[in-house]
């Protein structure tokens, strides 16, 4: 098993070049599905993070009760209402009918209220059948989804509690044991696992990347939603789950370091969003 610590030089290889004559839509189209009556902000953070990663278009699907508040945050968001307040089979069918033909990646689960597990499974399977790369987080991390994901270009981004719910095992406090468990589960289920923590562990079961953040300000709520948007945004262009997840973790951390230096321990996740552009600019490559 190859293990590597993430560095700027390594991550630069994971960020694709952009053609000087490229057109709108050629640099990534992303779908974000999330939100609920209580957690309206999560998909907003993910969507703006995906845009800041350099994605051309982001479609944000939230319950209809959240549509006005989501649209009011940014004119850059293309909002598709979910017809029900929670994820149902009917809501998924209508969403699938409203999506553009070309869709590169999607992130699902941030703040999402799910009424029917089968609705989530239907959404995941339908997107995978369209060759859409997926990043699953939060509410989407349930064990029932695992049989659909094997070797399908999927990233899961759990924290320790979500890891337990998804895989049925608690990550150890021992760093080495955590790494081994992530590698084991990634290999067993044919997916890329990004276990969030003070050290992010990213593995596809054959290669593992480590990123030790040491950014205590990033315990604030919503940083994981930003990360999910970065994963989806990078996945829409790179299309390699391991590299995209590793780059997303690194960039999220770089942005966090910039914000912590400015604001100390008083940051919010919204503060990360403009800094994504700042820290990603040195990675830009134009062909």
Curated annotation (Swiss-Prot):
| Chain positions recorded as AMP binding sites | 196-200, 224
Q: Which residues form the YjeF C-terminal domain?
A: 7-283
The protein's required cofactor(s) are namely: Mg(2+)
UniProt KW tRNA processing keyword: no
A Pfam family assignment: Carb_kinase
| Biological process annotations from GO | metabolite repair; nicotinamide nucleotide metabolic process
Enzyme Commission designation: 4.2.1.136
* MF (Gene Ontology): ADP-dependent NAD(P)H-hydrate dehydratase activity; ATP binding
Q: Which UniProt keywords apply?
A: ATP-binding, Lyase, NAD, NADP, Nucleotide-binding
Task: Tell me the residue numbers annotated for binding (6S)-NADPHX.
Answer: 42, 159, 225
Does Chaperone show up as a keyword for this record?
no
List, alphabetically, the InterPro entries matched: Carbohydrate_kinase_pred_CS (IPR017953), CARKD (IPR000631), Ribokinase-like (IPR029056)
Q: Which reaction does this chain catalyze?
A: (6S)-NADHX + ADP = AMP + phosphate + NADH + H(+); (6S)-NADPHX + ADP = AMP + phosphate + NADPH + H(+)
Q: Which family does it belong to?
A: Belongs to the NnrD/CARKD family.
Per UniProt, subunit arrangement is: Homotetramer.
Please explain the role this protein plays, according to its UniProt record: Catalyzes the dehydration of the S-form of NAD(P)HX at the expense of ADP, which is converted to AMP. Together with NAD(P)HX epimerase, which catalyzes the epimerization of the S- and R-forms, the enzyme allows the repair of both epimers of NAD(P)HX, a damaged form of NAD(P)H that is a result of enzymatic or heat-dependent hydration.
The protein's name in its UniProt record: ADP-dependent (S)-NAD(P)H-hydrate dehydratase
Its lineage reads: Archaea, Nitrososphaerota, Nitrososphaeria, Nitrosopumilales, Nitrosopumilaceae
Which gene carries the instructions for this protein? nnrD
